[in-house]
Structure formats: structure tokens, C-alpha cells
Amino acid sequence: MKETIKNMAAYEAELPVAEVKATYGVSHVARLSANESPYGPSPKVGPAIRDVSDDVLGFYPDGQATALRQAVAKLEQVNPDSLVFGAGADELIELLTRVILTPNDNVIVPNPTFGEYAMHAQIEQATTKSIPVNQDTGHVDFDAMFDAVDEHTTMVWLANPNNPTGVFETRSDILSFLQKLPQSVVLVVDEAYYDFVDQIDATVIRDVKDYPNLVVLRTLSKAYGLANLRIGYGVMQEPLYQVMQAVRLPYNLNTYQITGAVAALSDQLYLQSVVAKVKSEREKFEQFLTKHQFKYYQSQTNFLWIKVGDAKRVGEALLSEGYQINDRLNAEWIRIALGTVSDNEGMQRILLNF
């Protein structure tokens, strides 16, 4: 067993809804800890999956996910032969680190950010350098991240918008940073929450063709409401594309996943309606936080990062009323996914006590 992972803690999943109801005696539980969508997927998804013939069950699925590959390539205007699919973006994060990192390497990440980047570096016995974000705005410190690059740096991770801060960096700032990096350093831009961004200059996905050391990740778990189906994809150039295709598990997306994803992508009007609801609720919640003098960062996602003093105490108070939020990331900050109107108003009433 690798010494670096011998004492690694397992992922702590959300408490089952039934357990929360039984423990706290509540009739309604709002799952707002994993940034899932309270609105669910497009109404086209369920019927599409149910229409899949039982005849396919005895055969392996399309190992190239051809229908999904074509749908994503058309929607995002990228080369279909630059797409690698995975069971959520999580699988692609794991594969990228496995393919790129060696025990002598280091990776650079903002702090705070999504914990899986450092976790998978640890599994590969690489070192992670964490660079604090701007404490006032939450923006990534690109200068400090560049200064941290050395001869052993092989990857830089950038969640954009960042998780858990929700803060968004512009395409121009990202490309300026990328252009300074050595070609030997791969910049992975994780755009899991891109669909919620309402600013221009929002994505670098179509810049991959111009930069061999740029990779972009996406997921259908958030705005598309398909967290249970586990669908993610990455856009990258050769030779990384071919190596990733060789290393990933064959048939890693089944027919139901592929069919549901294609149906979801075909319904952009539904996606737009979800994003509009999230934006409206985000703006109202931020107005509440400003009015009551909570520190938070301006978000371009479906969640908020809020300083509350004692995260565990506030998290327990919310959970006791049926609101599951994430209080495990920082001792003083909580991450709250935006729920329905009534859920958000209910959480605000509780936050007034702190």
C-alpha cells in the first residue's frame, strides 16, 4: 500500500434523506450540500431513457458514446475527436492525474478549491501547492500561482467558476496566465459550473484547439440536473487525448447515461429556464447577505460561500430544520446550494440567528 494514502479518509457523502427525517423529526429535507439541482433534468430525459429497448441489456454499450460525442461537439463547436467521456467529471480528474503525474511532480491549485484535485495528486504521490485566493474578493491570484511554478510542476488546476467560492475568472485572464506557462505544464480548467455564468468571455473550451497544454472539463451533474447519471467530458488535444482514451475503462458510459445526456443537451430552453431561476434566487440571497452584513463572495454559480463564524454550529442548526448544507470545508465558512424559493427563505430565517 502507498504510504501517501494509507491514512486517507473516505469521501463523506450526504446523510440519506430518510435518516435526516428520522433523526430531526422533519417532514421536508432540502439537499443543498452537493450543489445538485432542485429542479431536476429536462422533461425529455425520463421518456428518452424509458424508450431504450430491453434488448440492449445483454450487450455492451457504444464504447465511443457516438451519439453523445456528436451532440456535445455540435453544441460546443469542438472537434468530436477531442472529447473524452467519463462517469462524471470526477473520473476525468482521476484519469488526468493518473496519466500526467509522477511522484516527483507537483500540482498547483488555488485555495480553497475542489478537494479532488489534491486528493488524486496525493494518490499519485505527487505534491500539491495551494495558493490562497484574494481574501477580499475570492479571485484567483494568478501572479502567485505562476510564481509557484517550478521545474517539477506538471499540472495547474483551475475550477472556473471556483468551488467552493463561486468566483468566476474571465477567459482573457485565464489565457494570459496560460500563455506564460511552460508547454510542459498542463492547465486544466474545470468548468463544472460554467452554465450558470451570466458574463461574457466565459469559457475557454474553444481555445483548446490552439493550446496543446489546455484541458477543459464539463459535467451534466449541475445545471442539467443529471447528477445521478454521472456524465462528464473533457476536451483536449493529442497526444493527451489518445492516452486518455487508452487508459479510461472501456464502456464507461452505459446506454441509459448516453441517451439521457443527449436528451438533456437537446433541450436548451429548459436549461435556460433553470439558469434563470438560479440567477434570480442567487441575487435575492446575496441581497439578504449584504443587508445583514454577512461576508460572502460574488457567485456565478448555483451556490454561495458564506462566512458564519462557526460553520459546524450553523450547519447543525440548518440540518435540524431539514436543510443539508456543506459545513465541512472550512471552520468559519459554509457552502449553501441555492434551493427553491421556500428553501432559500427558510435558510435565511435561520441565518438571522447567527
From Swiss-Prot:
EC assignment: 2.6.1.9
Superkingdom classification of source: Bacteria
GO molecular function, one term: histidinol-phosphate transaminase activity
First-tier enzyme category under EC: transferase
SUPFAM superfamilies listed in its UniProt record: PLP-dependent transferases
Catalytic activity: L-histidinol phosphate + 2-oxoglutarate = 3-(imidazol-4-yl)-2-oxopropyl phosphate + L-glutamate
Cofactors required: pyridoxal 5'-phosphate
Modified residues (N6-(pyridoxal phosphate)lysine): K222
This protein's record includes keyword Amino-acid biosynthesis: yes
Pathway: Amino-acid biosynthesis; L-histidine biosynthesis; L-histidine from 5-phospho-alpha-D-ribose 1-diphosphate: step 7/9
Family the UniProt entry places it in: Belongs to the class-II pyridoxal-phosphate-dependent aminotransferase family. Histidinol-phosphate aminotransferase subfamily.
Assembly information from the UniProt record: Homodimer.
HAMAP family named among the record's database cross-references: HisC_aminotrans_2
Name under which the protein is recorded: Histidinol-phosphate aminotransferase
Originating organism: Leuconostoc citreum (strain KM20)
Gene: hisC
